[in-house]
A protein has these predicted regions:
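Alpha-helical interface subdomain recognition
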Residues: 1-102
Length: 102
């Protein structure tokens, strides 16, 4: 659980940094994409780990954990898939245009 907590904190800090940059009128597409990708990935991983810990009750529709697990997958792809976010970050890091990297 410590690793999941550390990953969650890392995602939170990426999102905070992106928001701070936006508030200060700084370009933040790379940071926003990293935050979206990290938060989506870790949110999904945490919810699936919780389902695993709770065993059969984690899959029961009588408990909210099943809903959280489904919702985390939707939120993971809502703002663009992981591959799209990774492509945006790669373009920024390598200083390439969308035509250069497809």
């Amino acid at each position: 659980l410590e690793i999941l907590e550390a990953e969650l904190e890392a995602a939170r800090l990426l999102v905070y940094k992106s928001a701070w940059m936006m508030d200060n009128k700084m370009p933040n597409s790379k940071e926003a994409s990293m935050g979206k990708a990290k938060a989506g990935r870790i949110g999904n991983r945490i919810s699936l780990k919780c389902v695993e810990i709770c065993s059969m009750q984690g899959f029961s529709e009588d408990h909210l954990l099943e809903k959280f697990s489904r919702d985390s997958k939707i939120l993971d792809i809502f703002e663009g898939t992981q591959q799209i976010q990774q492509l945006i970050v790669a373009r920024q890091v390598l200083n390439k245009s969308s035509a250069d990297l497809k």
